Amino acid sequence: NSCLGAGVVDCEPIGKLHDLGYLPIEIVALPEGMKVPMGCPCFGITNTHPDFAWLPQALESLISAELWYPMICATVGHTYRKIVDKYYELTCDDNIDRSRALGNFDFRGDQGLDAALKAASGWLLSFKNTATVPAIPFVSEHFNTPITEVGFGAVSTEHFVMCSNYAADGDEKTFIKKMLTELYPDTSFSCVCDSYDYWNVVENILPELKEEILAHNGCMLV
C-alpha cells in the first residue's frame, strides 16, 4: 500500500501461495554454458496451478535480474577468447596456454560484491586470470571444482603504491628495483608505471635495471 497506493495490489493471492507451500511452476532452460544466437530464449517459466497464472510474470524480473549480467560477461569473455585464439594461432610457435592471455579488472567498478562475483564468474569461463580473487573460491564451491583449476589472481601494484614509494624514496627507480630483487624475486607481477613519467621508465629506468630484470624469476608486466 505504501509503495504502489492503497488497495492497488491484492495481497490475497500471495497469502494463498504461502498456504500452498511451494512454487507451482515449471522452468525449462538451455543447458548451462550453451552458446546461442541473439533472439533465442534462454529459459521459460510455465504455471502449473490454475490459481496462480500471475506467478511466472512475477518471477520473471527476479530471475532475469540474476541472470543477465553474468551471461553478458561470459559472452564478452568468449568474444575476447575467440580473438585471442585467432591471433595466437597466427603468431605463436608454441602451445601457450591461451586461457592466461587476458584478465578482468572490473572489481572496483562493479555495483557491489555480488555483481563483481557474477562478472568474474562469467569471465572465468574463457580465461583464468582475474583480479576479482573472491570469485575463484566462489566458482570452485558452486561447481565443485578444484580451486586450482578455476583461475588465479596476480600480484599488481596500485597507483597509490607507486606514488607513496616515490614519496619515500625520492625517485622512480628504487621501488621498481626493490620489487624485482626483494619483494617478488620469484613471482610475476604487474607494475603500474603511468603514475611516473611512463616513457622515462620505459626508455631509461628499465634499461638501467636490465640485469635485475634478467635475473628475476618471473615476468614483470609494465
Language-model segments: residues:
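Buried, small/hydrophobic-residue-enriched core segments of structured protein domains
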Residues: 3, 8-9, 15-24, 33-36, ...
